[in-house]
Swiss-Prot record:
Residue spans of biased composition, Basic and acidic residues class: 851-877
Subunit structure: Interacts with occludin OCLN, claudins and TPJ1. Interacts with PATJ. Interacts with UBN1. Interacts with FASLG. Interacts with CCND1.
Entry-linked Pfam families: Guanylate_kin, PDZ, SH3_2
Residues where Phosphothreonine is found: T317
Domain Guanylate kinase-like: 573-754
Function: Tjp1, Tjp2, and Tjp3 are closely related scaffolding proteins that link tight junction (TJ) transmembrane proteins such as claudins, junctional adhesion molecules, and occludin to the actin cytoskeleton. The tight junction acts to limit movement of substances through the paracellular space and as a boundary between the compositionally distinct apical and basolateral plasma membrane domains of epithelial and endothelial cells. Binds and recruits PatJ to tight junctions where it connects and stabilizes apical and lateral components of tight junctions.
Organism, as annotated: Mus musculus
Record protein name field: Tight junction protein ZO-3
Biased composition (Low complexity): 124-133
């Protein structure tokens, strides 16, 4: 017997325990000897006990792949999971395979008993009672011809009319013994009560249906029709859908490795066909991987259902091939069936085929989904809960509403509405979509019931929305719960319809609120509060740009204090400096407009697959860059600059950074703060290290010790460093203090670069599908000069040989008081994580939180609008009282589930 290790794929949903967490320990990673991230321990009594095992290989966490990553990256991904984690693992299983023998001569096949022994041999047991070994069984006589067309039964070598069916095990599936003609059987399961379950767990196995004569498989002679595919490029094929298999094969990039199990009886390719072999539309085919899957019109026409009653799947049956009938209009969500042509003495059998591409099953929906239709009235009569992390659920139904009449119940998951998938929508997006439907329009909902322990467990977890955003504008905090932020801050949004705001609430015209937690530099959640939603953020960002253009908002080019006015008037006398200073002052805001970046950008945590560029800021930047390239030329390379055609300043081409990264080196850049912003926008994500001087005398002593021949002014370098820390602190990855005359700061620089390269970074969500090796980011929507990085080194280092007066930074306005207290930026703030598991304490403040934002964005709120808000609040309250079957969030456990945040429609 030969042993074979196959990989079974399992997905477990873990709910974090407040004391034990998820209850697993992980180790390994591609930086370790094991290579894969492995579950090294499972804590007894934890959520992972009974679901995960020691030795499981973690493949995916909440949709993020953790294959070929470091263990630190996998741990960070698990840490970002707030309350729930969907963990997909690979679990090895050893199976016994019989020793291979020469295949029988063409036109012959194994006897029925031999085929049964073959199936049992794969299982690796001796329960069949046959004491013979595989070698003895292989020497048994073979007789009979196998008919590919016509007769579909197998007869024994003795010519009897009965034979044992094929008992085949392929990972998850065992095909039961069939009768002589392998007739399909029809079984109807009818629910008597809603609490009943069908009690069937289905599995699937991919097999080779057909081999084209012109393909590589036909020329290789290593594959045959009917072979069971166990692995595709090392990934177990058990329970994979055809669409998932297609995507897996398309990612093979020219080399496809298949682990197959030979089915000598070719049972799967000999299933009695109900239609002609030429009707390929009835079985979805993935052989043509160069084109999209399509569903061709069938050659025969499906008649009305055999029975008058409508099943939950609304299944239909096709008429016999010989008598085509006019085609009935079908719903795309139906699961159709085909029937065996009737013959004398035989009854009719339904063979449920592989669902079409348009069916719900192929899109990941289970067969117990329901389709309900009703016209939209003044109100929909539903209360929605959940979000993009768990799905959209019905947490309440208004008695007497059309939804109630169609049988929608509390706990139903809404999968689709009028062709719009709801599985990845936030609660705010789902509510806005439903409210956007005009009254009187027919609504077709695809729902799925969630009952039992899984429903209670989900409702108690209080999870819903979960995604991460990066901000691209500035906002002042609005106490007590309104969070402020600057450009580059990252937030974890957990509720897109914070109680008391948004669609369906009385304050909707004031703008909605998102409940979010600020992410710290350690990738942990810090303080939690509310921020404006997407539409409100767009208004505030536009207001910020308008105020900056008018010179009255934050970051405006014209100062309001006397000292700023003095520097402004002084810059007017320096005509050559004014244009450059003013242009660079507006560069950051203009960059956002040029790149078409929204106020909020969806981001995900991902490991960098290339050597990130390094920007060193501060009074010793030139010394650090020179030492790095001298000591480690194989790791670092200074990006060369070139002169502008219309300006004496210099630039660095983005292509230069890309070329250095392709050499597996860190590009050392001497660029301006706005160029750092641009690098982040085009997803190069530089490592920005700021060397902070302790004082001007200490800086002078350090420069004299490190570079005694330098003539650069310590006063000027210190002033530049103060200004950088004040205005560009949000760009710093790390800040290293300069103490004394030792080189400890240089050792810290090298350590920071090494640590940051290994850490995951926040990358744009919409770029996940691009190649990780493609660093050429041309065509990302930037302006014509987006490929250039300004490297006027007076802005961030001490390359200036003169000590003349001038603008301190190329990207800031006129000089300001550098002695002012430097306020720490949002990303630089260090505070202990504050967890607010039950954010009901924030309820009731939805109006007061937005007062300051409303004053900033709209000072013309009329009395008529306030009256409309009052009427809307009254209607909302009246609608809530009509809910007889919905549970309020304050209800007790005896009354029903605590659904957490929910929205009435």
């Amino acid at each position: 017997m030969e042993e074979l290790t196959i990989w079974e794929q399992h997905t477990a949903t873990l709910y974090k325990d407040p004391r034990r967490g998820f209850g697993i320990a992980v180790s390994g990673g591609h930086d370790r000897a094991s290579g894969s991230v492995v579950v090294s321990d499972v804590v007894p009594g934890s959520p992972a006990e009974g679901r995960l095992r020691t030795g499981d290989h973690i493949v995916m966490v909440n949709g993020v792949s953790v294959e070929n990553v470091t263990s630190a990256f996998a741990i960070q991904i698990l840490k970002t999971c707030t309350k729930t984690a969907n963990v997909t693992v690979k679990r090895p299983r050893r199976v016994q395979l019989p020793a291979t023998k020469a295949s029988p001569a063409s036109g012959h096949q194994l006897s029925d008993q031999e085929e049964a022994d073959h199936g049992r041999g794969y299982e690796g047991d001796s329960s069949s009672g046959s004491g013979r070994s595989w070698g003895e069984r292989s020497r048994r006589s073979r007789a009979g011809r196998r008919g590919r067309v016509g007769s579909h039964g197998r007869r024994s070598s003795g010519g009897g009319s009965e034979a044992n069916g094929l008992d085949l095990v392929s990972g998850y599936k065992r095909l039961p013994k069939q009768d002589v003609l392998m007739r399909p059987l029809k079984s109807v399961l009818v629910k008597r009560r809603n609490s009943e379950e069908f009690g069937v767990k289905l599995g699937s196995q991919i097999f080779i249906k057909h081999i084209t004569e012109s393909g590589l498989a036909a020329r290789n002679h290593g594959l045959q029709e009917g072979d069971l595919i166990l692995q595709i490029n090392g990934v177990s094929s058990a329970n994979l859908s055809l669409s998932d298999t297609r995507r897996l094969i398309e990612k093979s990039e020219g080399e496809l490795t298949l682990l197959v199990l030979r089915d000598s009886g070719q049972f799967l390719v000999n299933i009695p066909p109900a239609v002609s072999d030429s009707d390929s539309s009835l079985m979805e085919d993935i052989s043509d991987l160069t084109s999209e899957l399509s569903q061709a019109p069938p050659s025969h026409v499906p008649p009305p259902p055999l029975k008058g009653q409508r099943s939950p799947e609304d299944s239909q049956t096709d008429s016999p091939v010989e008598t085509p009938q006019p085609r009935r209009r079908e719903r795309s969500v139906n699961s159709r069936a085909i029937a065996e042509p009737e013959s004398p003495g035989e009854s009719r059998y339904d063979i449920y085929r592989v669902p079409s591409r348009q069916s719900l099953e192929d899109r990941g929906y289970s067969p117990d989904t329901r389709v309900v239709s009703f016209p939209k009235g003044a109100s929909i009569g539903l209360r929605l809960a959940g979000g993009n992390d768990v799905g959209i659920f019905v947490s309440g139904v208004q008695a007497g509403s059309p939804a109630d009449g169609q049988g929608i119940q509390e706990g139903d998951e809404i999968l689709q509405v009028n062709g719009m998938p709801f599985r990845n929508l936030t609660r705010e997006e789902a509510v806005q979509f439903l409210l956007g439907l005009p009254p009187g329009e027919d609504m077709e909902l695809v729902t799925q019931s969630k009952t039992g322990h899984s429903l209670r467990r989900w409702s108690q977890s209080r999870v819903g929305d979960s995604f991460y955003i990066r901000t691209h504008f500035e906002l002042e905090p609005s106490p007590p719960y309104g969070l402020g932020f600057t450009r580059g801050d990252v937030f974890h949004v957990v509720d897109t319809l914070y109680p008391g705001s948004g669609p369906g609430h009385g304050h909707s015209s004031h703008g909605g609120l998102w409940l979010a937690a600020r992410m710290g530099r350690d990738l942990r959640e810090q303080e939690r509060g509310v921020i404006p939603n997407q539409s409100r953020a767009e208004q505030l960002a536009s207001l910020e740009a308008a105020q900056r253009a008018a010179g009255v908002g934050p970051g405006a080019s014209v100062g309001s204090n006397p000292r700023a006015e003095f520097w402004r008037l002084r810059s007017l006398r320096r005509g050559t400096k004014k244009a450059s200073t003013q242009r660079s002052r507006e560069d950051l805001s203009a960059l956002t407009r040029q790149g078409h970046y929204p106020p909020y950008e969806r981001v995900v945590l991902r490991e960098a697959s290339f050597k990130r560029p390094v920007v060193i800021l501060g009074p010793v930047a030139d010394i650090a860059m020179k030492k790095l390239t001298t000591e480690m030329p194989e790791e670092f390379e200074i990006a060369e600059s070139m002169s502008r055609t219309d300006s004496p300043s210099k630039i660095i081409k983005l292509d230069t950074v890309r070329v250095i990264a392709e050499r597996d080196k860190h590009a050392l850049l001497d660029v301006t703060p706005s160029a750092i912003e641009r690098l982040n926008y085009v997803q190069y994500y530089p490592i920005v290290i700021f060397c902070a001087p302790e004082s001007r005398p200490a800086l002078k002593a350090l420069r004299e010790w490190l570079a005694p021949a330098s003539r650069r002014s310590s006063r000027r370098l210190y002033a530049q460093a103060q200004k950088l820390q004040k205005h560009s602190g949000h760009l710093f990855t790390a800040t290293i203090p300069l103490h004394g005359t030792s080189d400890s700061w240089y050792q810290e620089v090298k350590a920071v670069i090494q640590q940051q390269q290994a850490r995951p970074i926040w990358t744009a969500e919409d770029q996940l599908n691009s190649s990780s090796e493609d660093l050429d980011l041309t065509g990302h929507g930037l302006a014509a000069s987006s490929g250039d990085l300004s490297c006027d080194s007076r802005t961030n280092s001490d390359y200036e040989d003169t000590d003349g007066e001038g603008a301190y930074t190329d990207r800031e306005g006129g000089p300001q008081d550098v002695d002012e207290e430097v306020a720490p930026t949002a990303l630089a703030r260090s505070s202990e994580p504050v967890w607010v598991d039950d954010h009901q304490g924030l309820m009731g403040h939805g109006t007061t939180i937005t007062d300051k934002w409303e004053t900033q964005a709209d000072s013309h709120y009329t009395q008529d609008q306030r009256r409309q808000d009052s009427m809307r609040t009254y209607k909302h309250e009246a609608l809530r009282k009509k809910f007889t079957r919905a549970r309020d969030v304050e209800s007790s456990d005896d009354e029903g589930y605590d659904w957490g945040p929910a929205t009435d429609l």
